[in-house]
Amino acid sequence: MSADKFNEILKMFQQQMAMQDIPDREKAKKWEEYLFWKTQPVPKFDEDIDSEGPIEHKKLEDVRPTPYNLPAEYEWSDVDIENPEHIQEVYDLLYDNYVEDDDATFRFKYSASFLDWALKPPGWQKTWYPCVRVAATGKMVAFISAIPTSIQLRDNDLIKAVEINFLCVHKKLRSKRLAPVLIKEITRRVNQKDIWQALYTAGVVLPSPVSTCRYYHRPLNWTKLYEIGFSAIPPNQTAASMVARYTLPKEVPLKVRAMTKADVKAVHAILQNYLSAASEMSQHFSEEEVAHWFVDPISEDKNDDKIVYSYVVEEDGKVIDFFSFYKLDHTVLKEWATESNLRAAYGFYYATSSLSSAKARQDRVKELIGSAVILANNLGFEVYNELTLLDNPSHLDDLKFGCGDGYLNYYLFNYRAQPVHGGLDKQKQLEQLDGKGVGVIML
């Protein structure tokens, strides 16, 4: 069978598998059924948006001075993210109760070092990590976090905002409606710092997504992925043919090196220029944020505590390209699985100086991500994941990524905005535009 025919069959199989999931994900409740969200400053579904900007305009004196009430058996507590014991409590809560895939096969495994990196960017605030504890025992049963960010949405003024993440409620307490109280409380605490907008993501449909992206996966260790139920064998194929398809060279085609602190200024410049060229909604980085997010203090690649891997390409002593990915392992939940851990790399930010045209930009990005995939494989990662944002749609097929069954909806709180392209067409299939899309990557 020719390579072209094989690719055609595989692509059809992937699309058929993916399309089975789309109808359920498309279902959104009626506006009236969103008992909490209909009380919040968020757009309704299909709302006509004539102009972009804040929905509500409030002042500091409007902010409630005291925490929101909890059921009598629970109490508020602040997580000290510099206290290893508190971080361990957050880890335990997330490990047992946080995001799983629909089939309850995999769960994110946020390590203590990952949480330390994710929750302490420049400008982090001690009061932005509230949790709920059982009053009688002190057991942590719910958590939410906020970190500062700045969002550039098209040509609008820079949006001073926060990213909301790690909203988690103990499984046995989901009927207590603690999540809405957590959201209101973190909103109150953020408002106290004169910040009125937020960015958050969710796999579920809420009022009202500004964009929707889809997960794509590039197998690195296909045999392992097959054995744990992550990958399947398409019709008329064998395990041997799949292993052969996804085999990678050891040598990286580009001359790359690990990013260091000395590269921060150069990376900051090319990253901001690239995001302006390739996205309609992006994070606006400071040099301090570039240093935090992309320069891991652990330099040894094989160290289990290392989280982010960043690389640069130089030409005549000048940094011209940059790419990164981060480690987020998954726990395998199925009892029949022979392995309990999936070592996953997630594509993070990248940038190139090749901005003369959309095609030049996308061709160079394909080379960068092709190198990232090889490096991740050499480091022992078993799958490389990307979303359909930035210029990713232009290389996903060529680099042998397969569409997953996971979607990620992006939301803006207290901000009305026109939709931002998420790399998908109306049927939720891959669509590359020469224009701009989502340029924000949340952990």
From Swiss-Prot:
Residue positions binding tetradecanoyl-CoA: Y34, L35, F36, W37, L167, C168, V169, S175, K176, R177, L178, A179
Annotated GO CC locations: cytosol
InterPro entries reported in the protein's UniProt record: Acyl_CoA_acyltransferase, NMT, NMT_C, NMT_CS, NMT_N
Keywords, comma-separated and alphabetical: Acyltransferase, Cytoplasm, Transferase
Main localization category: cytoplasm
Enzyme Commission numbers on file: 2.3.1.97
PROSITE patterns in UniProt: NMT_1, NMT_2
Subcellular localization: Cytoplasm
Reactions mediated catalytically: N-terminal glycyl-[protein] + tetradecanoyl-CoA = N-tetradecanoylglycyl-[protein] + CoA + H(+)
Function: Adds a myristoyl group to the N-terminal glycine residue of certain cellular proteins.
PANTHER family membership: GLYCYLPEPTIDE N-TETRADECANOYLTRANSFERASE (PTHR11377:SF5), N-MYRISTOYL TRANSFERASE (PTHR11377)
Protein name: Glycylpeptide N-tetradecanoyltransferase
